[in-house]
Regions:
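Short gly/ser/thr-rich secondary-structure transition/capping motifs
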Residues: 100-106, 132, 156-160, 221-226, ...
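Short beta-alpha junction loops
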Residues: 83-86, 154-156, 343-344
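N-terminal small/polar loop signature for handling phosphorylated ligands or for N-terminal nucleophile
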Residues: 65-143, 278-290, 299-300, 304
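Internal gly/pro-rich beta-alpha loop/helix module
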Residues: 116-117, 122-213
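Small-residue (G/A/S/T)-rich helix-start motifs and N-terminal tracts that mark the onset
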Residues: 1-79, 89, 174, 185-339, ...
Length: 505
């Protein structure tokens, strides 16, 4: 698990290292430059000619130091000061003086076509306004050059918190970011502008008490999944109830239930309309199918299950509305874990009085369109503030919010947040969300290997990460263009095996 920081959090960490620990800012700048040179050298070939483009802030100071280090290695390098020299920070002015002493070549009118590598050190995480005018022209020239492109800490023009483009942004092949990955390097388009991202240790003081605004999971976090109990039975590995599948929509029920079983749930029951019974029993004989919706049957299903999933293929008819309301109310009464997805969310948006049944036992899994219906905000507003939207939804409902997008945000009412970096565009296909709801249900049934009972938000984040990992494995063999939702399920065994390898099993 890796911490992800906002611009303010990174500034505070810098300040703590410099003022409280006593590490001079010049030392941090030198270490940053060394890391950029170290990573850039991996891409260099013979007869390289490097241009480092520098602003007047500390990002520019990093860049001048990079130019000096390349110069001392005998590599052809020049630096170009696009920032106002009269407004250089103290550290950058010192780097400029040192570079002058070492006679590092400086250019005032670079011929962009002559360079094989361009290093962007114009703006860092401190950028607060759109880039325009002279600076925009320079970044346009940098992007147009046929050269390898390296960004120092963050591509100029990328918002360090949201990943949004601030007027124009540098398009890098490699970004060497310092100490922690910035949140803006997780969200698109910032993640796209960054290219390959390397997080470099430059000596920023790290203490356990440092609270970051978000975190992201890695393959090694799958070791939190428990070993399969050798004397367990199908009942002890989790029982999931799916309230789903209107007529003609048994595919959603099948995908969701199948994913739950493949992800490790011991038993599955699907409550659906009678017309779906035979198709489901043929497609998934391991599942039990119930087509009764009366009080007695509902009570039996509620008593039987450990987790409820409402929504995939449910429809929005009067009968579907009544089924959802019954199970929402009952789950709230018994605090039974419940996942609300697809039409379950659409019905919730149409009946805001049901919000009273939500709480910490609920996981909401909206995509951007469903969140727009739930929140009343436009899709563009949500895309521009996706993290804040997820946090607000979680706070207002008391539930875990899994806001699905290219970078899915998982948040709870306490402000704990995960950004998911697994997955790919091949997963943007019909049924992928149904598969996710099934995987989440299976994970909610598990007792993770943690010292304390883990919060629901961590289980949800693990489920989302596992879903994305399956998609990455599928894309590697099938290609993103050809992927189907069922391919994600197909690769669950391989993805779970990676978790077992991380656990040393």
């Amino acid at each position: 698990m890796k911490k992800l920081v906002t611009c303010k959090e990174m500034k505070d960490l810098d300040s703590t290292t410099i003022r409280e620990i006593g590490v001079p800012s010049e030392v941090l700048m030198e270490r940053a430059a060394l890391k950029v040179v170290e990573e850039t050298e991996k891409y260099l070939q013979k007869d390289e000619r490097i241009l480092v483009v520098c602003g007047s802030g500390n990002n520019g100071g990093d860049g001048i130091a990079v130019a000096r280090l390349f110069h001392l290695k005998g590599i052809r390098v020049e630096f170009y000061m696009v920032g106002n020299k009269d407004k250089m920070t103290r550290e950058t002015a010192l780097q400029y003086k040192i570079a002058s002493g070492y006679r590092v070549p400086e250019v005032n009118n670079p011929q962009w076509s002559e360079y094989t590598t361009i290093v962007d050190a114009v703006f860092g995480v401190g950028l607060t306004r759109p880039i325009e005018g002279h600076y925009a022209d320079i970044i346009h020239e940098m992007n147009s050059a046929r050269a390898k492109k390296i960004a120092v800490d963050i591509p100029s023009g990328v918002n360090g918190d949201t990943g949004l483009e601030m007027g124009i942004a540098f398009s890098a092949d490699l970004t060497v970011t310092f100490a922690y990955r910035k949140r803006g390097l997780c969200f698109y388009p910032g993640r796209l502008y960054a290219g390959r991202i390397v997080t470099a240790d430059i000596g920023i003081y790290e203490q356990e008490a440092v609270t970051a605004s978000a975190a992201c999971l890695e393959n090694k976090d799958l070791q939190l999944f428990p070993e399969r109990d050798p004397d367990g039975n199908k009942g002890t590995f989790g029982k999931v109830l799916f309230v789903t599948g209107s007529e003609g929509m048994c595919g959603a029920a099948y995908l969701s239930a199948s994913a739950a079983l493949r992800a490790g749930a011991g038993m599955v029951k699907i409550q659906t309309v009678e017309a779906n019974r035979i198709p489901l029993q043929i497609l998934l004989p391991e599942a039990m199918v119930c087509s009764r919706f009366d009080q007695e049957s509902n009570e039996q299903l509620l008593s039987w299950c450990d987790v409820i999933v409402i929504g995939p293929g449910l429809g929005t008819s009067v009968a579907s509305r009544e089924r959802e309301q019954w199970f929402l109310t009952a789950a709230a009464r018994e605090k039974k874990p419940l996942i609300l997805d697809a039409d379950g969310l659409n019905l919730l948006a149409a009946h805001p009085q049901w919000y009273q049944y939500l709480g910490e036992h609920v996981v909401l899994t909206p995509h951007i369109g469903e969140m727009s219906r739930l929140s009343g905000r436009t899709i563009q507003e949500i895309q521009h503030e996706i993290a804040d939207t997820a946090l607000k939804c979680a706070a207002e409902t008391g539930s875990v919010c899994v806001l699905k997008d290219a970078c899915t945000v998982i948040a709870d009412e306490k402000g704990q947040m995960y950004l998911n970096l697994s997955g790919n565009s091949g997963m943007a296909t019909a049924g992928s969300g149904d598969v996710l709801s099934g995987i989440l249900a299976a994970v909610l049934c598990m007792y993770l290997k943690t010292e304390e009972q883990p919060p629901m938000v961590l289980k949800a984040a693990l489920g989302v990460y596992l879903h994305g990992l399956c998609g990455d494995l599928a894309a590697a063999e099938k290609g993103m263009r050809s992927m189907l939702a069922g391919d994600i399920i197909e690769y669950l065994p391989k993805a779970l095996a990676i978790g077992e390898e991380e656990s040393g099993l």
